[in-house]
Amino acid sequence: MTLASPPQIKPLTDEELHKINAYWRAANYLSVGQIYLLDNPLLREPLNKEHVKPRLLGHWGTTPGLNFIYVHLNRIIKKYDQSMVYIAGPGHGGPGLVANTYLEGTYSEYYPNISQDAGGMQKLFKQFSFPGGIPSHVAPETPGSIHEGGELGYALVHAFGAAFDNPDLIVAAVVGDGEAETGALATSWHSNKFLNPASDGAVLPILHLNGYKIANPTVLARLSYEELESLFVGYGYKPYFVEGSDPALVHQQMAAILDTVIAEIHSIQREARVHGFSKRPQWPMIILRTPKGWTGPKEVDGKKTEDYWRSHQVPFGNVTGNPEHLKLLEEWLKSYKPEELFDANGKLIPELAELAPKGDRRMGDNPHANGGILLRDLVMPDFQNYAIEVPQPGRVMAEATQVTGKFLRDVMKLNLDSRNFRVFGPDETASNRINAVLDVTDRTWVAQKLPEDDHLDPSGRVMEILSETCCQGWLEGYLLTGRHGFFSCYEAFIHIIDSMFNQHAKWLKTTRHISWRRPVASLNYLLTSHVWRQDHNGFSHQDPGFIDHVVNKKSEIIRVYLPPDANTLLSVTDHCLRSRNYVNVIVAGKQPALQFLDMDAAVKHCTKGIGIWEWASNDQGSEPDVVMACAGDVPTLETLAAVDILRQHFPDLKVRVVNVVDLMTLQPKTEHPHGLNPKDFETIFTTDKPIIFAFHGYPWLIHRLTYRQPNHNNLHVRGYKEEGTTTTPFDMVVLNDLDRFHLVMDVIDRVPKLGYKAAYVKQQLQDKLIEHKHYISQHGEDMPDISDWQWPY
């Protein structure tokens, strides 16, 4: 038998075949009912237009295939007592997953009002894509779902993320042939190079070739067997083909192939667990080719519909206004013979109900799909033990991420036995200087190894692949199944997963309002190699805009932190690793930098999120003349250097220095739970004094966050304004008017009392900027009085 040939054996008895096909019919019937019906759920009376929804929404085309796979996986779960999670890549087939969780009983357990009778079925139908009801996709509201599948491309990475460190779990990942055309999905086939059969679970990819997308054929469906086989053998899989349109034949094929692949998976795992890991296995996968819109109308209004793109969404509309369409819908629904599937009360008949697994073996009730149930707190070292000694502010140098790397190393060490913490990054763990974690673990790697390879091992817990999308997807799958993780990335290139962040934030927002969904560990980003220290790589590597993107999401979900030094980064990192159901974004530098706060001060500052730095201010006992605010490590440095210049030239000027570590404190409390109420904002920023705000990112973000706060008219923000190149570190801030000299000139322009002396000081500052340009063009580095500056007070 070649890989492309289905087996000729028939593993199902006639009775088993009849029951499996009947169960599939029931799932298909419930799926069509959700799309079309408002009432008359069991067709106990002739269908009329009052029984049909006025707006028909949903996707039929992929749904019968999803239902077909589900019933066959149920058989496997029962036969092998296998723990299994179902990921529907084509998540627009939401009716199918809702139907199957209803048939197995889990849906009614989570939603008792959707009961196992005719009344419950009517509610099930009505609620789908209906105001006040449920969404059309495999959304968080769907029991058993960890993957909505609305934005395509992430089925496999979520599946592998779920399988890591879950040795008893098989994740069935259905990949739609449309989804298979996305870049994210194309790369995620390589996840098999990171799956350790000795300690991880397994992923069973099921590539569903139904041939069409919304209005076009799919690429993979038009490849020959030989090309498909070569493609997936090249990816490292052993593909098995199942295909056809005759349900009886395809049921037998699918049952036989599933028996084969499950036996292979168990054999691979048994070999690795008994004898140890020896080489990367060739994991099996299934390529299932069935008609799009299978069992639906073959034609509508004389046009081909089944096995064609016209069945993708609602195969036909205008049911209430077209008697022929109403008749067609009734015939379609009756073709499933619901009277044979449901009893007089509308409940699935017992001989079919027994096909579903029991308890938490049901895929809708598998605890891995509600990961908060399994979540255990990390064992955490005391972050204060890693403190940098700061006897005086602005004198000691340290690398913030390197210090935090030692803390993460010990987080990893303390949780090695629990196997519930991993670090993720696109080949940047060393570059971002958190590579101390490699003192206690290695990079995960099950592909070929060479003698000179460094820190590569199948049991490693640092996940590195040069794909931000894979890292993000693995981490999401890992978190949603009840574990913890940490993702470090270059700041500019985290934009690659902007849309993935969107989807995860939406998932978290929705789950907060679903009582049975338990909180999961937060998704924690460390963004470093940031805009102000990418002077060596140039303009392409300079973009602080991810935080602009993040703050668009619901305040109950997102947190943004800009720790100015190593001790504050330690405090923030500890806080984020302990948190639940958030997306935490930390932006911090990796280069040697001045340290400002000892650990006690850092903890207090991070707890408040914003505060006046008394040691840097000289307005005690009086009103300040100007507020110098800053957020971010480099803006903090430039602000303090500017304050030094102001003190030298204007010793009578009263300056208040405010540092922001929790960016969301700037919003009003009505907008974000961390926000300041207007009175507290006035206390810090005054009611009428100029505020010069040096910000890490794009200036208008500060204006957005504070526009409802008092004294906004006096707020002047400096930040990144899309000026950059390969240059020196200080020249980067000069190019964007964020340097100490421009900040002082901003004060001069906004504090009238400085009088005649201001003109001379301003001219001196302009001369310094000219001197700077000449110096770097001649020497290729910053002037010593810039690079060697320290806080002198």
UniProtKB/Swiss-Prot annotation:
Print the keywords alphabetically.
Lyase, Thiamine pyrophosphate
SS bond list: none
Stated EC number for the protein is 4.1.2.-
Provide an example Pfam family for this protein: XFP
Q: Which InterPro entries match?
A: Phosphoketolase, THDP-binding, Transketo_C/PFOR_II, Xul5P/Fru6P_PKetolase, Xul5P/Fru6P_PKetolase_C, Xul5P/Fru6P_PKetolase_CS, Xul5P/Fru6P_PKetolase_N, Xul5P/Fru6P_PKetolase_ThDP_BS
Gene3D superfamilies named in the record:
3.40.50.920, 3.40.50.970
Can the keyword tRNA processing be found in this entry's annotation? no
- The UniProt record lists the keyword Transcription: no
Q: Which residues does UniProt call coiled coil?
A: none
**Cofactor(s) the record lists:** thiamine diphosphate
According to its UniProt entry, the protein's GO biological process terms are: carbohydrate metabolic process
Recorded GO molecular functions are: aldehyde-lyase activity
Q: Which superkingdom does the taxonomy of this entry point to? A: Bacteria
Q: Which family does it belong to?
A: Belongs to the XFP family.
Listed HAMAP family: Phosphoketolase
Protein name per its UniProtKB record: Probable phosphoketolase 2
